[in-house]
Amino acid sequence: MKKTIFLLILLFTTVLADEIDFNFDGWDRECYLYKPSCIPDNPGEDFEPVPLVLMFHGLGGEGEDNYDFTSLAEDSCFMVAFPSGMYNTWNLGPEAPGGHDIDDISYIEALVDTIYNYYPLDTNKIYATGHSAGGGFTNHLACATTKFTALGSAAAYLWTAFEHWGEGLDSDLAEEYNYLCDPMTIGYTMPMIHFHGRMDWGVFVEWGEMSAVQGALR
């Protein structure tokens, strides 16, 4: 199916923070965008392009929940986008909690392209990060798109490892399903970093063994 995208930008070039409303593939999508003050309203050809970071919220959240991240963007001169997932989550795969089948990957690719059309972005410095379900979606990006330079997640899994959830969390299954995110299969590698707390009672660190095997391949 051909993907279409329509964009309404509110005060896009005159203020530091904007809400962007997309209609992508028939769905109304929302994203908050932060432009640091180091970027002038009309940057000339000599202006050095800046990095872009996408930050993904967890299950039950929305983009504006992560807006405190803007102080770091202001200090270090990079742009930040805070997309909102449909139904307050992301498409992490058929067995992921609270998931759906909306094409979030294509939406995020279109979002990056659209921001690039309006702002001086360094396409070699496009990053993504997320927490919990947002971290799971960040991990999923490593297997599904080449838009990003590097990825970082916290309190999350690579949910493709759990697409056969009903068969149990046996580490032997990890090797069988490594093809879901194997650089030899998808043709590229992706720098990644992940953080997880041992006292996390929502996303158990012990369940990450299968995910870790695949993550090591990235």
Question: Can you name each region flagged by the protein language model?
Answer:
Residues 22-38, 44-127, 131, 136-140, ...:
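Serine-hydrolase catalytic machinery in alpha/beta-hydrolase-like enzymes
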Residues 150, 155-218:
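The feature captures the conserved acid-bearing segment of alpha/beta-hydrolase catalytic domains
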Residues 12-13, 67, 210:
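Alpha-helical transmembrane segments and their juxtamembrane interfaces
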Residues 15-17:
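Boundary at the C-terminal end of the N-terminal hydrophobic targeting segment
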